[in-house]
């Protein structure tokens, strides 16, 4: 049966760390935790937790340099252990969520792939991330910030369905100054970097940092720089989608906003996020027939099984919500009521939205009765 070692770098994570460790406890046989300069109770929390649960562990202290350097150093310490078959790398604000049918012994007995990718849910979006990899595979991290795992081309990979990760480090958990600080780190990295791939990646995350820091004009410029680099279509799609959303937020001319959304959609026509946004944008501008067209087209698309930052709610109920409103705005109350009935049958519809859906259904019904 394969053994799994948890590898983490932490700093000032006392308030969130125990939740992460509790969630991953069923999987791990050993833990290597590297503290990079905490001035809170992080180290005490780690030591107490693993002693309480009788998990073999080592706690190291390291000077902070950057994310990839410190993660690679932590993995070097892990390599001192000869009894760990797989490394599992998590952040302190990750939570492992197991399916009800998960059998840890069966899972470990059947482990044979080099790398296991898990779905990550963060801030309403989903993507995949390698979370388990074979100890002797030679993986390492790159990137001063928003680091990523470099995996040998010959590695065999498998997508884990028995568990996924919930990341609690969404934009709302950090203030704007923190994101602008990240942007400063990335700007410095861009001045030093020469690798075209890393340059494209840094431009992408520079756009993300400025956007979340509230500097939309700099974010748009950074995302355009990412688009000019070419490459991975999913990253190009997200860059163009973010540009369109910020243009709408900054009240750019209507034709520019619509063109920006269409440009994003043309890169990944299997993605419905631009169509949802276009439907909502058209509704707000009282173009109800346009809204109906965009929402209807979006509803024809299945949620992709793989992709970068897939917005799950758009595919499960939000497009249908927009279609309800658009049909009503077009005066097609029968169609609006029928769509509303379908919406209320959706298990994914949050309780907070059901009242609004009921009101929409009542309004459509009253309109039909008055005809």
Regions found by a protein language model. Give the residues of each.
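"A position-specific structural signal for the A-helix of alpha-solenoid helical repeats
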Residues: 205, 242, 277-280, 319-322, ...
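Short, well-formed alpha-helical segments that are part of the catalytic scaffolds
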Residues: 7-30
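Catalytic-site signature of metal-activated, phosphate-bearing donor transferases
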Residues: 68-76, 86-89, 94-221, 225, ...
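Residue at a conserved register position within TPR or TPR-like alpha-solenoid repeats
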Residues: 210, 247-248, 282, 327, ...
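Conserved donor nucleotide-binding strand/loop of the catalytic core
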Residues: 47-77
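Short coil turns that delineate tetratricopeptide repeat
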Residues: 194-197, 231-234, 269, 303, ...
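A conserved acidic beta->alpha catalytic loop
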Residues: 23, 27, 33-46, 63-64, ...
């Amino acid at each position: 049966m394969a053994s799994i070692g948890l590898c983490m770098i932490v700093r000032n994570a006392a308030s969130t760390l125990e939740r992460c460790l509790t969630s991953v406890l069923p999987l791990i046989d050993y833990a290597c935790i590297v503290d990079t300069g905490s001035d809170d109770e992080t180290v005490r929390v780690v030591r107490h937790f693993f002693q309480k649960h009788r998990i073999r562990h080592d706690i190291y202290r390291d000077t902070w340099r950057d994310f990839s350097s410190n993660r690679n150093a932590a993995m070097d310490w892990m390599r001192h252990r000869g009894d760990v078959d797989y490394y599992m790398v998590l952040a302190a604000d990750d939570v492992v969520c197991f399916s009800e049918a998960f059998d840890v012994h069966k899972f470990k007995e059947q482990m044979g792939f080099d790398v296991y990718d898990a779905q990550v849910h963060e801030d309403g979006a989903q993507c995949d991330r390698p979370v388990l990899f074979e100890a002797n595979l030679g993986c390492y991290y790159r990137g001063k910030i928003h680091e990523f795992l470099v995996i040998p081309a010959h590695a065999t990979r498998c997508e884990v369905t028995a568990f996924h990760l919930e990341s609690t480090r969404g934009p709302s958990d950090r203030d704007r100054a923190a994101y602008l600080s990240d942007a400063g780190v990335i700007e410095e990295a861009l001045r030093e970097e020469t690798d075209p791939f890393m340059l494209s990646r840094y431009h992408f995350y520079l756009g993300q940092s400025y956007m979340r820091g509230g500097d939309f004009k700099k974010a748009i410029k950074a995302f355009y720089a990412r688009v000019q680099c070419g490459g991975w279509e999913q990253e190009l799609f997200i860059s163009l989608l973010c540009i369109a959303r910020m243009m709408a937020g900054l009240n750019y001319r209507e034709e520019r906003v619509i063109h920006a959304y269409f440009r994003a959609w043309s890169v990944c026509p299997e993605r419905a996020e631009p169509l949802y946004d276009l439907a909502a944008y058209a509704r707000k501008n009282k173009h109800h027939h346009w809204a109906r067209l965009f929402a209807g087209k979006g509803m024809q698309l299945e949620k992709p099984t793989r992709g970068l930052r897939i917005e799950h709610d758009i595919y499960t109920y939000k497009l249908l919500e927009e279609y309800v409103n658009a049909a009503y705005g077009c005066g097609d109350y029968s169609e609006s009521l029928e769509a509303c009935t379908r919406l209320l049958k959706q298990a994914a519809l949050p309780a907070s939205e059901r009242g609004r859906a009921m009101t929409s259904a009542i309004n459509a019904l009253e309109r039909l009765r008055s005809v």
